Amino acid sequence: MKKVLKIILATVLFIFIAIQFYQPALNVDKGQVYTTDFTQVYKMPIEIKAMFQTSCYDCHSNNTNYVWYDYVQPARTLVGTHIKNAKEDLNFNEWGTYSNRKQERLLNSIKEQIETKQMPLSSYTLMHKNAKLNN
C-alpha cells in the first residue's frame, strides 16, 4: 500500500512540475495608453477611474496585474482562459471602438451586474480584497 501511495504521489508531483513548463501568453500591454479606453472616452474623477481599474481592468482590459500564484499552473491557464472570455464580452481598452448601441447595452449590463453583486466576481474579490465595490 505504501509503495502504491509513493508511486501515486511521485506521479502527481511529476505532472505538477511538468505542467509548469506550459506558460500561456500573459495579458500585458506594457503600459500602453489607449485613446479608445473607457476612462478616456468618459472623463471621470481620478477616484472613479482608479476604482474601475482596480475592480474591472484585470479581466476586462489588455493589461492584467498578475500576482505570484497566477504564474503557477494550473492557475495560469484558468486565469488566462477567464481573462480571454471576459475580454470577449467587454474590453475597457476598446470601449471607443464599440457602437453607441453596444456601449449603451454594456453600460446597462455593467450597472445591473454591479447592483446585483455579480461583478466583480466573488472568486476574484476573495483574492483581491481591494477590488470589492462598496455601496
Language-model features: locations:
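Electrostatic cytochrome c docking/interface patches
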Residues: K30-F52
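Aromatic-capped interface at the extracytoplasmic side
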Residues: Q20-Q32
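Acidic helix-start/capping segments at beta-turn-to-alpha-helix junctions
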Residues: Y66-L78
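The canonical Cys-X-X-Cys-His
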Residues: F52-T64
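Hydrophobic membrane-insertion alpha-helices, especially the h-region
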Residues: I7-Q23
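Positively charged n-region of N-terminal signal peptides that target proteins for export
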Residues: M1-I7
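Short, exposed beta-strand-loop hairpins at the edges of beta-sheets
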Residues: K129-N134
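Extracytoplasmic electron-transfer domains, predominantly the class I c-type cytochrome c fold
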Residues: T77-L126
